[in-house]
Structure formats: structure tokens, C-alpha cells
Amino acid sequence: MSCQFVLAARRVVQFPPGMAGNVLRGALGSALRGALNPEDYAHIFEPAAREPGAIAGGPSGLSNWPRPFAIRCAALNGRILQPGDRFCFVVHLFDLRNSALDHFTQAFAQWAQLISVEQASVTVDLDARPSPVSRIRVEFQTPTELKSSDGDAKDFPVLLARARDRVSTLRSLYGPGPLEIDFRGVAERARSVKTVRSELRHVAVERRSRRTGQRHGIGGQVGFSEFEGDVAEFLPYLEAASFTGVGRHCTWGNGQIHTKILTPEF
């Protein structure tokens, strides 16, 4: 589900460059902690992997489960709001079995004046496209960090693996179950897709934890990469990733991607 929140500032609100997601993180966390019981708060804001192997068919080594939402707020970066100024952002919700939208609405209404909430159902067909596609461009619209010893955002197998695994994990925890696919086979076929053009730059951003005082890097690569090969099978995962985000800190607005189908160059 995609939800657009429109609010008006009650006081001066600053969104430093690259930090809009962190500002919303602080506001949402404080409001939810005060409004919800510990169990509901943990489910939304601090889901922990309580049982080994609980995510069947998904990636191993998860010490914390992904949160059941992703915020899209890049347009707020660098803005300074005065009292009464309107602003908006989008929250993609992945857990529709609980009252997450009500909790979010209550929390943001405590932080600012709530004007409206518009919601729309989102469905992505994960079946391969029927028509062949041989060249695509993936735009990394917000800083994207893909942790891998095998490569980074310009390497298609790495990008595809992160997008596929995030979709499967979210389905396992909050939806109908993990992807029923041959993960190894998908990975093998993804290796045949080659990077033919890449214009990426690194954006350095840090946030300071209020709880520990430590600084954490939340930057990543922005720009685009173009890939060539038999990519029709993989497009649904990339389309889903445009809603879920991909890579580190995608809950807070990082890892926002958009995929375009290109005409092959001969």
C-alpha cells in the first residue's frame, strides 16, 4: 500500500541535505514510542529476528528483520519549513495485516498538523515479461549502498540479488510467504547481464545516533547504470524494488530506484 501524507508544520522544521529520512525517523520513533504499547512499537519500528531460520528461503545472517515500511521523502532534503508551511512524503506499507496505517497517522498527527492521507493499493506481478527486453537503465535516485564482496550498484548480479532478497524477505515476514523460485538459477542467469554504461557518484552523508552518540554513514551512490542482456525475467524484481527500496537504509529513503526499458543500440 502506498500512502501520501500531507501535513503542515507547527514550528520551524529543518531537513538538512540528505537527512530528510533521518528527521522523519526521529519524529516517527518518538511519537510511536509514546503512543503504542511495547509490542506494537517493536513490530513496526524495531522488528527483531526472534527465531533462527524464521525467514524460510531468504538470505541468512539477518540479526534484525526489515521494518514493514519504506519512506519516500527525497523532495524534503534541504528544505526549511516555517509554521504553517505544507509538506508531503510517501510511506509504502508492506504489512497490511495490522493497524500500521492507523499508527502512522496517529504518530505524524502528533508531530505536525495532519491535512490528509491518501492511500492506494499497489500490486506488482512477479512473473517474467512476455516480450523480450535486452537493455535497461536503472536510475539510483537516492544514495544506494549495496554491501557485497562481489561488486556494487554498477554490477547487475549484485543489484538483482539485493532486490530479489528484499522482496522475498518482506513477503516472508509480512505477506504470503517467500518467493517460490530457484534462487541459484536466477543468480546464474543474472550473471549473463552486462554493464554497458555507468555514471555513478558517491554521496557522503552521516547521521548521529541520539541514543549512543555514534556517527553512522548513510550515504551511497547516485546516478545510473545501463545493463544489456536477457533481462525480461528480472524486470518484476526491479519494479518491486522501486517500492521496497534496495540496499542499506532503504526504510528511510535510501535505495530508491527507477528502471527504464531502452531501445537496443546496434
Where are these regions (language model features)?
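RNA-interacting cores
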Residues: 1-266
